[in-house]
Amino acid sequence: MAQLPPKIPTMTTPNWPDFSSQKLPSIAATAAAAATAGPQQQNPSWMDEFLDFSATRRGTHRRSISDSIAFLEPPSSGVGNHHFDRFDDEQFMSMFNDDVHNNNHNHHHHHSINGNVGPTRSSSNTSTPSDHNSLSDDDNNKEAPPSDHDHHMDNNVANQNNAAGNNYNESDEVQSQCKTEPQDGPSANQNSGGSSGNRIHDPKRVKRILANRQSAQRSRVRKLQYISELERSVTSLQTEVSVLSPRVAFLDHQRLLLNVDNSAIKQRIAALAQDKIFKDAHQEALKREIERLRQVYHQQSLKKMENNVSDQSPADIKPSVEKEQLLNV
C-alpha cells in the first residue's frame, strides 16, 4: 500500500484557469497549487517524471489542435495607409502627434512594468503563452508557485507590449517616410524617441513632404498622359501608313511606266529633229535648182528671141517682147 500513488488531494476552492486573459495555467502551476493545499503531502516520483515528460514534449512543438485558445497577432500598421494622400495638413499633424504621444506613454509604461515584474514576451514571438509555460515548468518546480495575480500581470504586460510594438512599427514607418537628414554635434547622441518627435513636429518638413509627394504624383500623371498621347499618335500614323502604302506602290509603278514613255517620246523627238534637218537641206537644194533652171530658161528664151528677130520683121518683134515680159513676171 505504501508504493501506490496517493489519492487526489482535496481542495477547498478549485484553481480554474482565467479565460478572460487568454492564458491557460501550466501543469506546474496546478501541481504547486495542490502542494499548497496539502503541504504535508510530498510529490511522488511518478508526478515529477510526468511533469518532466510533459514539459519536454510541449517544448518541441508550438501549438496543436487540442489547444482551445489561439493568440492572434494585431494587424500590421501599413493597412491604413491607402488613403494617406487624402489627409490635409492638420489631420496629418494630429495623427503624428497622437502616434508620438502614445508611443512615449507606452514606452515609459513598458519600462516601469519591466522594472517591477521582469522580462516579458516580445510581440514578434509567434509562440503561444502555453508553450512558454511548458518550457519553464522545470524552473517553476524549483521555485515558488505563481499566483493568479501574477498570471493577470503577465497577460496585461503582454498586451501592453503588443500595443507598444505596433506603435514602434508605426513610428518607424513615419520616420522612413519623412526622409530625415542626419544630425551633427551633440544632438546626434539623443535617443530615437526625442529625435523622432522633433522631426514629426516640424510643420515645414511635413508640408515639404506633402508638396514633394503631390508634385511627384502630378509628374507621374503628366508622364502617363504624354505616353498615352504618343501611343495614340503612333497608332494613327501606323493606320495612315497602312492605308497609303498601297497607293504609294501604285503611284511608283505608274511613275516607272511614264518614265519609259517619256524616254520613248524623247527618242522620237530626236529622230524628228534630224528628219527636219534633212528636209530643210533638201528644200534649200531644190530652191537652188529652181533658180538655176529659171536662169537657163531665160537665157534660152533670149537666144530664141535674137534668132527670131533676125529672121522676122520688126512688126513681129513687138508681140514677142511682150510675151517675154509676161514670162519673167
UniProtKB/Swiss-Prot annotation:
Stretches the record annotates as Leucine-zipper: 230-251
Primary location class: nucleus
Which is one Gene Ontology cellular component term of this protein? Answer: nucleus
Keyword Transcription regulation listed? The answer is yes
Which keywords belong to this entry? Activator, Nucleus, Transcription, Transcription regulation
Compartment(s) where it occurs, according to its Swiss-Prot or TrEMBL record: Nucleus
Superkingdom of source: Eukaryota
Q: Which PANTHER family match?
A: BASIC LEUCINE ZIPPER 34 (PTHR46391), BASIC LEUCINE ZIPPER 61 (PTHR46391:SF20)
Q: What is this protein called?
A: Basic leucine zipper 61
